Amino acid sequence: YAQSSSKHLAEAGLEFELRQIPREELEAAIKDANQDSNVSGILVYYPVYGDKRDQDLQDMVDPTKDVEGLNVVYNGKLYGNDRFLDEDKTRKAILPCTPLAVVKVLDHIGVYDHDLPYGDHLRGKTIAVVNRSEVVGRPLAALLANDGAKVYSIDINDIQIFERDQAASINSHVISKTDFKVEDVIPLCDVVITGVPSAGYKMPTKLLKPGVVAVNFASVRNFEPEVKEVASIYVPSVGKVTVSMLQRNLLRLFNYQH
């Protein structure tokens, strides 16, 4: 991802500097980058610790330079389904690059229905997200649910449902725990999105609904080769779109700074 980011940012005329920092020096490095007027955006490659300390690092990044949108400020906006940073709605909140890339891919291939009202473009869609990391899977499930989908969020421990609370005064999602198994929910899904960072993991093709949209955002292929025989659309990677979203976030932050 770092190499791809560097290449594509350079092609767009944007400077990318990879700083390899020992873990024990990372906090100081983030603070230095926050104060450096020559730095327009900061991207930390996670996981660093693989626990809640990573969230502490995310919250250390200055929101005006947080190109991944993982700071508590942007998290609050995402999970509260509030797209703007200001009351006048002139500055949009930054969204995490990979979840945003998946959303853009789904929109491009026609999963989003723009004949429905704004905020309901995924109404009637059932989607599985096989990954619940704080960096990708959880925010992706929230984004999809906030757009009206019923989302089965699947990780190694359990399956949770993310969906809009139609009775609530705000238009954000609620989360319900379930006792479902993967084989219970995957056949119900119009879209199956995988992001398991293991070459040994494969989504069983036999579980997939005929005509399903299958999207993989992991660095390895999570679907079996036979997926092409079942899926109406199969997207094996969103890496290039993710880098495009990184560029988009960076340019948006640069405009906010100036």
Where in this protein do the model-derived segments appear?
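A short, aliphatic-rich alpha-helical micro-motif
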Residues: D36, V185-P187, L207-L208
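Redox-cofactor binding/interface segments in oxidoreductases and associated redox assembly factors
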Residues: G41-V44, T194, V215-N216, P236
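Long, contiguous binding/interaction regions
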Residues: A12
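Short glycine-/small-residue-rich Rossmann-like dinucleotide-binding loops
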Residues: P47, G195-S198, A218-S219
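Phosphate/diphosphate ligand-binding glycine-rich loop within oxidoreductases
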Residues: E15-P96, E224-V227
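Short hydrophobic/charged patches on amphipathic alpha-helices used for structural packing
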Residues: E27-K31, K181-E183, T205
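Rossmann-fold NAD(P)-binding glycine/threonine-rich loop
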Residues: Q55-N71, N75-L85, G200, P210-H258
